[in-house]
């Protein structure tokens, strides 16, 4: 999709140009330290983010250690904006409007400020939007593969930032509610197998 590529490149380019080259405020110092030296973040610990960051900053391509963590957040944020475009198209928002909305979200002050520092929110948004997209795909197609992928990504999202994922759960349930009978029937098959 050319729109996705445009959103990805525009947001990532702007994030890279404005990304700090040093440690910033909030939790960035803590996350920089943990990503480079190991450890556990403040509660709830953010295990998915920490493990991803540790792997990313240890790639042998970075000259400045601080930039690696910030870059990872920028990549997650740009990917989130691209997935938002997919969600908008699933909701029948097409053309220039969907691209514009994804760009406006990616360039909003709050999102941008978190996208350019090493912080858990860009990954949380990315995972939530993937969950939203998978829920919409399941609603539209009733293919079980979307439900299975949703379960996996939802679990990963909980291990990244459970409070934010919990806040978004009612939206996912509202989308899936009309398909509740199919979902229960799907879940009963393994439950019956385990009962044996």
Where are these predicted regions, by residue range?
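Transmembrane signal-anchor helices characteristic of membrane glycosylation enzymes that use polyprenol
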Residues: 1-25, 195-196
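Transmembrane-helix signature of polytopic, membrane-embedded enzymes
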Residues: 2-6, 84-107, 125-126, 145, ...
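Transmembrane-helix motifs of polytopic, lipid-linked glycan transferases
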Residues: 5, 9, 71-92, 130-134
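Membrane-interface alpha helices of multi-pass inner-membrane proteins
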Residues: 34-37, 101-103, 146-160, 172-174
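Short hydrophobic/aromatic helix or loop-helix immediately within or flanking a transmembrane segment
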Residues: 35-63, 74-75
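Membrane-interface transmembrane helices that cradle and orient dolichyl/undecaprenyl
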Residues: 89-92, 115, 131-147, 154-157, ...
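Short acidic/glycine- and proline-prone juxtamembrane loop motifs at membrane-interface regions
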Residues: 110-121
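Perimembrane helix-loop-helix junctions
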Residues: 167-196
């Amino acid at each position: 999709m050319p729109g996705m590529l445009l959103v990805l490149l525009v947001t990532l380019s702007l994030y890279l140009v404005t990304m700090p080259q040093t440690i910033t405020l909030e939790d960035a110092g803590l996350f920089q330290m943990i990503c480079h030296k190991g450890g556990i973040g403040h509660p709830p610990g953010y295990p998915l983010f920490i493990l991803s960051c540790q792997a990313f900053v240890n790639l042998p391509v970075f000259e400045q250690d601080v930039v690696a963590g910030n870059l990872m957040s920028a990549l997650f944020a740009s990917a989130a904006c691209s997935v938002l475009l997919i969600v908008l198209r699933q909701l029948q928002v097409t053309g220039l409007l969907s691209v514009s909305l994804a760009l406006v979200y990616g360039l909003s002050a709050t999102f941008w400020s978190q996208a350019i520092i090493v912080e858990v929110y860009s990954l949380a948004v990315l995972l939530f939007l993937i969950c939203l997209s998978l829920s919409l795909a399941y609603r539209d197609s009733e293919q079980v593969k979307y439900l299975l992928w949703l379960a996996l990504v939802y679990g990963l999202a909980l291990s990244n930032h459970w409070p934010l994922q919990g806040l978004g759960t009612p939206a996912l349930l509202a989308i899936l509610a009309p398909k509740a009978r199919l979902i229960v029937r799907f879940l009963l098959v393994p439950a019956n197998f385990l009962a044996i």
